[in-house]
């Protein structure tokens, strides 16, 4: 089963399960506000929510952005997009199916977006395509545009690994089985975090991809040291 197919299967119960995490929506708001604060509260903004899932991150971005901001939600999973489409959205928000690492940058508009937010995407991108996926968002951003990435990472942090393993094995996977019957998806989510880049390694990917002003912070609460928010800027054009 592909990753997209696994998310298709779990789409109908996904919001219920992630909503049981008390910090989930708060951290999405933090990421969305971090992006909008950096691109500026101004008319005519064009933003992308890459790996928008069921639209929770899109909603956070839409609420943080000025009225009239264009927000494009992209996701590989048809099932997730179907769930997102059931909600009520302003005319300036739309959704489209697309796969990170295989984006049609020319069709999406290279250099035409002021900001891109992506939550829980990069660990789902095959390692051999990760740098390409970073390059795609770089190409989509306008000069001076900002990228905000929210992602789990425990590599190189033994305390974070112990906490994550315990939460995944004794809470996430059992709840996933109980509420959704989808053991494979939640076991995959556990392992995808374990196998993902360290914080330093991912930050280095962003720098290698041409980004500057790369910084990161970790979440509060039980996710401290596990969930991280990265910010990075595409250089402005030299005058």
Q: Residue ranges of each PLM-predicted region?
A:
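Conserved class I S-adenosyl-L-methionine
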Residues: 1-41, 56, 60
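Class I SAM-dependent methyltransferase SAM/SAH-binding core
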Residues: 46-104
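A short acidic, Gly/Pro-enriched loop at the edge of an enzyme's catalytic core
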Residues: 101-116
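A short SAM/SAH-binding and catalytic strip from SAM-dependent methyltransferases
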Residues: 114-129
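A short glycine-rich, Lys/Arg-flanked "PGG" loop and its adjoining helix->strand segment in the class I
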Residues: 131-143
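Conserved beta-strand signature within the Rossmann-like core of class I S-adenosyl-L-methionine
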Residues: 144-151
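C-terminal alpha-helical "lid/dimerization" subdomain adjacent to the S-adenosyl-L-methionine
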Residues: 152-205
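Core SAM-dependent methyltransferase catalytic element
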Residues: 209-212, 218-239
